[in-house]
Amino acid sequence: MKDVREILKKRPLLFDGGMGTYYKAKPGQECEQANLLDPDGILTVHRAYLEAGADAIKTNTFGLPRMAAAQNPMWEAMADEGWKLAAQAAAKTSAAVFADLGPAPDTEALPAAQIYTALAERFAALGAKNFLFETLSSD
């Protein structure tokens, strides 16, 4: 796995595209659930992006902050499997893997910072060194 800082010294970093758009999860199923229910499908998408030339792929975990906030008991398993699948897909390449985290609701009962801390700690324990916090509002 290349150090993304070395790539960025030479050129922009080329990420994969949207997992949910490419995967087209089954109706009523969150894309992140496919980490557990269709791991081969998620691996196929990761590998397609790598074969297309992506320098980095994102874990299929964009929606986890929302799930963790809703206290979905499966968020940890989805995080673990999301990391495992992305790392497996990138293992024989020079691509970097980023733990991907989308927007989290910010409530008094469960502040967004607490959600992001729990998720970041989980991914760090799994070996993540790169994180992408995306599609966040400035509110």
Can you describe what each PLM-predicted range is?
Residues 1-139:
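Domain-level signal for soluble alpha/beta catalytic cores
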